[in-house]
Amino acid sequence: MKAFNKLFSLVVASVLVFSLAGCGDKEESKKFSANLNGTEIAITYVYKGDKVLKQSSETKIQFASIGATTKEDAAKTLEPLSAKYKNIAGVEEKLTYTDTYAQENVTIDMEKVDFKALQGISGINVSAEDAKKGITMAQMELVMKAAGFKEVK
């Protein structure tokens, strides 16, 4: 559970790293993946110039990695975390279960997200000024690689 909470905070924290954003003509995307403590994570960034427009994450959480053996056990741990995303502007979250793992998909529209509400999930503080500047793809690449993610080409 502690490992999952750290992992969960890492994913959210990656969203909240800010610096000045540039402009460009066409949208591009970059995908990063990692297997952290038995949890498979794939994060895709859509960006224009150097400004991140959207982040989508697909997380496959093995029940064993959170100390659960059944869907019901996993739900007791994961549903309260999932519920925190509900009603946050610019965030879509879906959590589904199989017999051995949970699949969480989260999409964050960086141009619509309520950063103040989002930071409440992980407890990270971001100033209003930083939120207005935007998130750069260059910074996200550094954050992802430092966290053990590899770019998927």
Curated annotation (Swiss-Prot):
What are the record keywords, sorted? Cell membrane, Lipoprotein, Membrane, Palmitate, Signal
In the UniProt record, does the keyword Ribonucleoprotein occur?
Answer: no
Name the lipidated positions (S-diacylglycerol cysteine): 23
- Report whether DNA damage shows up as a keyword of the record: no
Subcellular location, record wording: Cell membrane
The record describes its membrane topology as:
Lipid-anchor
- Identify the stretch annotated as signal peptide in this record: 1-22
GO cellular component term, pick one: plasma membrane
A Pfam family matched in the record? DUF1307
Main localization is: membrane
Residues annotated for lipidation of the kind N-palmitoyl cysteine are: 23
Which SUPFAM superfamilies does the entry mention?
YehR-like
Family, according to the entry, reads as follows: To L.monocytogenes lmo0207.
What name appears for this protein in its UniProt entry?
Uncharacterized lipoprotein YehR
Instruction: Give the originating organism.
Output: Escherichia coli (strain K12)
Gene name in the database record: yehR
